[in-house]
A protein has these predicted regions:
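Beta1/beta-strand and adjacent pyrophosphate-binding region of the FAD-binding site
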Residues: 3-19, 36
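Short, well-ordered coil/turn elements that cap or connect secondary structure elements
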Residues: 5, 30-32, 112-114
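Residue-level preference for short coil/turn positions at secondary-structure junctions
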Residues: 6-7, 14, 31, 52, ...
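Short secondary-structure boundary/capping segments within folded domains
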Residues: 12, 47-48, 81-83, 132
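Glycine-rich FAD pyrophosphate-binding loop
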Residues: 28-50
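Dinucleotide-binding Rossmann-like beta1-alpha1 core, especially the glycine-rich loop
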Residues: 53-131, 138
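Glycine-rich "substrate-gating" loop/helix at the edge of Rossmann-like oxidoreductase active sites
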Residues: 143-147
Length: 147
């Protein structure tokens, strides 16, 4: 390892996680050089949000910025060869009207922000995931771009 530099054009504090790594990648992609990254843990780190993430992306959110960022990330990972659009299913059980309402709100927001998400019936959910007990499902949110 070379000596730690005394100066740099850019210093990224917290390089070990997804955010710091993304900042570095995008700076380099846009022609920046002389970049130094530091992290209080090792690189990659296991203490930040990255290590606790689910490793699964749904494009649905209640705000445009989060939806846009997620859709950008999905396209980015796909271009890097590390994303598979396998589809994602979230279900509401019979009797859980609160959950059903939340899924419907997420679908409404997702559609408003340009995603391909939709509500599907219990029968359609079972077609996508045969292990489901159809009589236990009130409905489901289907995101074909999730992965």
């Amino acid at each position: 390892m070379s000596a730690f530099p005394s100066k740099a054009k850019v210093v990224i504090v917290g390089l070990g996680g997804i955010v710091g790594s993304s900042v570095a990648h995008h700076l380099i992609e846009n022609g920046w050089d002389d970049i130094v990254g530091i992290d209080k843990s090792g690189i990659p780190t296991d203490i930040g949000s990255t290590a606790h993430a689910s490793d699964f992306c749904y494009a649905t959110s209640h705000d445009l910025l989060t939806t846009w960022t997620t859709m950008y990330s999905m396209d980015f990972y796909e271009k890097m060869g590390h994303y598979a659009r396998i589809g994602g299913l979230e279900v509401a059980r019979v009797g859980d009207d609160e959950r059903m309402g939340e899924l419907k709100r997420r679908v409404d927001s997702g559609k408003a922000f340009g995603t391909n998400v939709k509500m599907i019936s219990a029968a359609e959910a079972k077609e996508k995931f045969p292990l489901l007990e159809e009589d236990q499902i009130q409905g489901a949110m289907w995101d074909p771009d999730a992965g």
